[in-house]
Every structure is written in C-alpha cells, then in structure tokens.
Amino acid sequence: SSPKQLPGTWSSGYNSIACGRHGGQGAVQADGVLKLWGNNQYGQLGQSNNTLYSSPVQVGTDTDWKACFASGLSCGGTKTAGTLWSWGRNNNGQLGHNSLTDRVAPFQVGTDTGWDSISGGWDGNLAFLKENGTLWVTGDNYYGQLGQNQAYAPSNKARSSPVQIPGTNWAKTNQAVGFQESFGLKTDGTLWAWQYNGEGALGQNSNVSNNSFYSSPVQIPGTNWSDISCRYKAAVASKTDGTWWVWGSNAEGQLGLSQATPVKLSSPTQIPGVWSQIISGHAAMLGFKA
C-alpha cells in the first residue's frame, strides 16, 4: 500500500519504464539492461517460458536496450542501433512479425532501423514511431484502429506487419493508445485522434454514442499541445502553457472536475490547478502538482 524500492539501479538514471495492463512491468537500466517482472502467460517477459516472476529478471544478455514498453499481454522495446523488438501475445498480429504466432523471447520487427519509441493499447494494437517522424501501427482494425480510412466493419482485417498512419511530422514519444482509442501529437503542436469514440473519448465535441468512430486521424480542437495520456475511454493532455485538459468518460469522476456529472465530455475541458504531470489509468488519473 506504499511505494517500495526495487532492486537495481533504477533511481540512478534509468532510460525507460513501462507498466502493462495484465502483463509485465519493466525498465531499462542506465547500463542498457532490460528487466521485466509480473504476469508471463504469453511469454511477455521474454524469458522463453510462461513462468510468473515476482521480481525483476533480465531479458536475454544484451546491454543495448534504449526503451521498453508493456501493453496488454505484449512487451517490446527499441535498441540503441534503432532496431525494433516485440514479444508476448500476438492474437491480432500486433507484434508486427507478419504472423499470429506468440513469442516468448524478443523477436525483431522486420529489418528496418531508425525506430524511436513504442506505445500500445490494452491487447490488440501497437504503435511504432520512427526517428523520421513517421508513425506505424499493427494489430486489430475492427474500429479503424489502424487509421487507414476504412469504413467501420467487423470484417476489417487486422495487420500483422506495420502500416503507416498518414503524415510525416509526428512528434517523438508523444503517441498514446488506449482501450479502443488512439492519439498522436505532431511537431506543430496539433493533436490528432482516431478509432473508437464512445463516451466522447476522441474529443470531437460530436456524437458520443457507443457506435461512433473515426477510421483516420481527426484533429482535436486547440493548438500548442505538448503531451497526451489515455487508458480507458478517457484522455488527459497538456499544453505548452502548462494547462491540462481532459475529455471522455467521467463515470467514476476520473476527469478530476470535482464531480461525477456529466458522465461524459466530448471536448477538451481544463482541469483546475497547476500540474507538472498527469497520467490516465483505468477509471482513474494520477498527477503531480507543480
């Protein structure tokens, strides 16, 4: 019920930290070692087995990891050479290996280099950002998650190899994939959304029914956006002036507006106070006061 320090050199200069929904947690140490722990049902801890680990274990022997991610039941990371790796559950082809085979150890995504960062949703999609500002996605496409401007249809095919989201000026490390909603920040400070719009999760000030969706990126009102976090039908984002804004489901009061009504907001609404960081969880948000 209170924070406990983990073994290792996490606090003396870690490069990346990740926390999954049902999967593993982990971090890249300052020495380039990747360690994971937690649920390992689909091999998402990269140990070539399905054993649960309650303390950090090293992934392989490599010491050139740059960043890591944990999402749903899949994990992965980038290396200093710019290569991209993923492992764990692959039921929708989300690992990007051109197959539906689960992986219990790190497996390289294609042969490209220049990969910068990764984000992932609950279980069915991953998003990969390249250093050249291009954004790529894999996995389920039921609600248009892949941003390919395909009409809503249960028959929309998942993609097991990365496909590019339109545009070439996506900002590094500022992409977010939630339950069934996706967001991307561009270098010009504009914020874009696509996928499922139930509860107003995409911030479009429009239809908030459970059946509305956008299968290609649409701009969220406003400019000068600087960060975005989402998890389950709700999102929080910051602007360069230090203000923070929320939208989506408010059924549990998770939007921080001192009330549980309205139960949904379909356009960005400012949170009172001065904050340095806010992240979105499942029916909750956490933040640091400035």
Regions found by a protein language model. Give the residues of each.
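Tandem repeat domain/solenoid detector
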Residues: 16, 30-33, 80-83, 116-117, ...
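A short beta-strand motif characteristic of beta-propeller blades
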Residues: 4-6, 56-58, 107-108, 163-164, ...
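Conserved beta-strand position repeated across blades of beta-propeller domains
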Residues: 18, 27, 69, 77, ...
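Short glycine/serine- and acidic-residue-enriched loop/turn motifs that recur at repeat junctions
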Residues: 1, 37-54, 87-104, 138-160, ...
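Signature tryptophan residues that serve as conserved aromatic anchors
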Residues: 35-37, 65, 85-87, 115, ...
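Acidic/polar residues in short coil/turn loops that connect beta-strands
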Residues: 31, 47-49, 80-81, 97-99, ...
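Conserved core positions of repeat-based scaffolds
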Residues: 2, 23-27, 36, 74-77, ...
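Disulfide-stabilized cysteine-rich extracellular repeat microdomains
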Residues: 8-11, 22, 42, 49-50, ...
